[in-house]
Amino acid sequence: MSTARTDDDSWEITESVGATALGVASARAAETRSENPLIKDPFAQVFLDAAGDGVWNWHSAPQLPPELIEAEPTIPLQQQAMVSYMASRTAFFDSFFLEATGAGIRQAVILAAGLDARSWRLPWPAGTTVYELDQPRVLEFKESTLAEHGAQPACNRVAVPVDLRHDWPEALRQAGFDASAPSVWSAEGLMPYLPAAAQDLLFDRIQGLTVAGSRVAVEALGPKFLDPQARAKRRERMDRIQALMARIDPDRAVPRTDELWYFEEREDVGEWFGRHGWDVRVTPSDELMAGYGRPAPAEVRDFVPGNLFVAAQRR
């Protein structure tokens, strides 16, 4: 299947890849309001309110269109499973950063920072600098929205507006990053939006910017991502939902995330870092969710991304 992407595409926060960041924020907002939240992100709803009405609000909406539930009876379970997945993913990266900075690392790099407000909501140790890299318009939306609400970062936050397909290492250095000191990195929700060659280049660049003791966490693609049956089921489901929403709410477009992804064979992320001198731990998404007490219901387990959570430390 061809992708809707181009080599130098960019987007507003309500468009293309930007809209997916709002969808993730919606899941974090729903989790934050839940009875026993795994994570607390008080800024997620702020972003949703600023962006206005859109399909990205589904996760945090009080109820879905009844016609949608009638046509897709398991969609409430699907939504809850995705909220649990996003909450588990967020908790994983939150803990990873706090463990690294607790061990003395004072430089953090968030690749494709999106709308996660870690710079504002995590208890960073004094003296920590957090570099957030993303498309300029995404960072502008985040900064202006939080500034309007009087929110102040809990660290020395440095925005690096750059496309990760361009020369972001130079932009990072120009922003003050010290490649001679240990650092901690994250690549969350990023891999499917990169071609295989761009993924390899991303890791090569991280390798060139890190020293012993540095740490990297990656949400890597699992075997299910390229599985023909899984892809066919995903397409069929999206076809049904799009057709239904076109009838009941034609002004609300349902984005096709799979048209934004690159379905290409690529090297296993854990193996890549293992070959390049890193100690690696890999946790499948179902194990991660179970470990946080958030397993997906059996009826919708196939709906949850089968991603792998890679944590690596450079020797």
Curated annotation (Swiss-Prot):
GO terms for molecular function: methyltransferase activity. One of its GO terms (biological process) is methylation. SUPFAM superfamilies: S-adenosyl-L-methionine-dependent methyltransferases. Its EC number is 2.1.1.-. Gene3D superfamilies: Vaccinia Virus protein VP39. InterPro entries: Ppm1/Ppm2/Tcmp, SAM-dependent_MTases_sf, SAM_mthyl_Trfase_ML2640-like. It comes from the Bacteria. Exhibits S-adenosyl-L-methionine-dependent methyltransferase activity. This is Putative S-adenosyl-L-methionine-dependent methyltransferase MAV_4557. It comes from Mycobacterium avium (strain 104).
